[in-house]
Amino acid sequence: STASVGVIHRDLAAKGLALPTSGASDGQSFAGAIATGTHGADMKVGALHDTVLAVHLVVSPTRSVLVQAAGGPLNGKAADTLGKWFGIACELLSDDQLFRAARVHLGSLGVVLNVVVAAVPLYYLSRLRTPHLDGASWRGVLRTRRPKNANGLHPEDPDYLQFIVHPYAPQPATDPRAWMVSMRKLAFNGQAGVATTPTDVSLKSDLADFLPPLVALFEADIELPNNPLLRGITSAQLRGIYGTTAATSLALPGAMFGPPDFLGIDFGSLRGASAEYVFDASQARPGVEVILNTLTEQASAGNQYLGGIGVRFVKGSDAWLAPNAASLN
């Protein structure tokens, strides 16, 4: 499906349902997010691909397969129906190993026509974001994954936990070095104050896409390394997006994150560059420290990183190629 995760969330909400995991944004293609294993960061459920019940793959011009785990919820009638709908014979395959391969297959096993995904009763997200100085409190939570230890405001056992980290020591030192975001899933029964449509659109985060080409254009005129103007822009961007005080919000899963277009401007067409590193949760703190130290070394060589670092925790997966794959015996 080319439908985004957010659209599917909002369609499900109209039926009193929701996807079990929400991730950190919702503009991605639903099928693409599953096939690449790049969406969803629920500490108790896992990623989006961990909620998939079956995958319908076209493996040749004349054959398709409906893959599910052994003892899965579908029967041969489902495969027969898909075959009639699409005019390609479909075979039901109920096999744990095939299912682990098919859920996150990076496009290598065939063309995804359909996915069957679990849905749960509609819930809302209670979100808390807090700023932290360049001290030990937020670093300690990287190790314990217990955000309440940082300042007592966050829940002890959240469903979602994320850090946004400034790549360099902030100037002035009284500015936040990191922001902690936790979310809990709570049953939705029409409570007042819960946003049901996307309203939180941060234009500042999209404007950051203009910084790298701007630097490239005026590179000869910008003194590197450690240019205070660039550091100031990065700090201002992060402050503007995440603030300097604690903030709370309540929203349905399809409303917590803004759409990719706003005021007629398609911000989804702007493209930056990113990299993703996966650590075992026990190595989260040393892993982040290695990244921060590397960025500092690169800045000394004149290569400044104009952005932030996002750290998310997710339950391990049994899908073979999932970035969050757990150790399997």
Task: Give residue ranges: language-model regions.
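Noncatalytic alpha-helical scaffold of FAD-dependent oxidoreductases
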Residues: 1-329
